[in-house]
Amino acid sequence: MADLEEQLSDEEKVRIAAKFIIHAPPGEFNEVFNDVRLLLNNDNLLREGAAHAFAQYNLDQFTPVKIEGYEDQVLITEHGDLGNGKFLDPKNRICFKFDHLRKEATDPRPYEAENAIESWRTSVETALRAYVKEHYPNGVCTVYGKKIDGQQTIIACIESHQFQAKNFWNGRWRSEWKFTITPSTTQVVGILKIQVHYYEDGNVQLVSHKDTQDPLPVSNEVQTAKEFIKIVEAAENEYQTAISENYQTMSDTTFKALRRQLPVTRTKIDWNKILSYKIGKEMQNA
C-alpha cells in the first residue's frame, strides 16, 4: 500500500478524492469529506485541488440554503450560478456568496434579473410553491426566468430530502422542469431523480432517474402556470408509483431468487441434533 501511495502524484490523489466527494450519498457529504481528508492527509491539497468537487456536489444535489434575514430557502443550482461563488435567489431578487464546504450563504445584495420574463416566473413560482407544500413536507423549490439562445425560458427546480442517520438511511428527491414561452404550445422537458442510501448491516443504494417531455398549452401567465403544475404532478406521481411497484416486484421475485429458502438437500438442519449428523461427528473428531 505504501508503494502504491508513493507512485501516485498529488494530482492523481486529488482526482480520486474528488470522485469520492462528488459521489457522496445525500446527507453524507461531511462523512465522506472527513474520510477522504484522513486518507489524503493534506488539508491544503484537498481544499485547493478538490474545491471544484465541493461545488459540483452542491450543484448536482440542489443543495438548499437559508439566507439570514429571508424566510424561504433557495436551491443551489447551475441555473442560479452567477460565477465567482455567487448565486441568485430569484424570489427575493438578491444574489449572495455561498461557501460550498460550509454550505453557508453570506453577503446578500439586491440583484435585478430578467425583468421581461418576471411576471411569468412569478406565476409559475406561486403555483409551484403551493404544489410543493402539498406534496413535499420538507420540499424546497426555486424558479428561474432567463433567456437561453434568445428564447424566454422558465426553469423550475424541486428538492426534498429526509436524512435519518440514526436509522441508517438518507434520501433525496430532485426534479427539474424547463419550458420556453412560445405562442400557442410549447414543450415541458423534465428530469426526475431519486437517490437513497441504506446502510444498516449492509450497503444498498437506489439511484434512479427519468426523462419526460409533454406538450404545454401557452395562454396567459396564470393559466399556463396551472397547466404546467398538472404536467409536473402527473409525471411525478407516475414516477413514484412506478418505483414503488418495481420494488414490490423485486421483493416478490428478484430478491427471493438470490438465495434458496432450503439447502440443496431440500431439508432444514435441526441444529439441536447436529451431533447425530455425519457432519457433526466429523466436526467433533476434527
Curated annotation (Swiss-Prot):
Which residues, renumbered to this chain, carry the PTM N-acetylalanine? A2
What does the record give as the organism's lineage? Eukaryota, Metazoa, Chordata, Craniata, Vertebrata
Task: Record the organism.
Answer: Rhinolophus ferrumequinum
Which gene does this sequence derive from? CAPZA2
Q: Name one GO cellular component term.
A: cortical cytoskeleton
Summarize the subunit comment: Component of the F-actin capping complex, composed of a heterodimer of an alpha and a beta subunit. Component of the WASH complex, composed of F-actin-capping protein subunit alpha (CAPZA1, CAPZA2 or CAPZA3), F-actin-capping protein subunit beta (CAPZB), WASHC1, WASHC2, WASHC3, WASHC4 and WASHC5. Interacts with RCSD1/CAPZIP.
**What does the UniProt record say this protein does?**
F-actin-capping proteins bind in a Ca(2+)-independent manner to the fast growing ends of actin filaments (barbed end) thereby blocking the exchange of subunits at these ends. Unlike other capping proteins (such as gelsolin and severin), these proteins do not sever actin filaments.
Q: Does the keyword Amino-acid biosynthesis apply?
A: no
The alphabetical list of record keywords is: Acetylation, Actin capping, Actin-binding, Phosphoprotein
Protein name stated in the entry: F-actin-capping protein subunit alpha-2
What is the disulfide pattern of this chain?
none
Q: Which residues carry this modification: Phosphoserine?
A: S9
Task: Report the Pfam families cross-referenced here.
Answer: F-actin_cap_A
Which processes are annotated in GO (biological process)?
actin cytoskeleton organization; barbed-end actin filament capping
Where does this protein have coiled-coil stretches? none
Q: Which Gene3D superfamilies match?
A: F-actin capping protein, alpha subunit (3.30.1140.60), F-actin capping protein, beta subunit (3.90.1150.210)
State any single GO MF term: actin filament binding
- What family is this? Belongs to the F-actin-capping protein alpha subunit family.
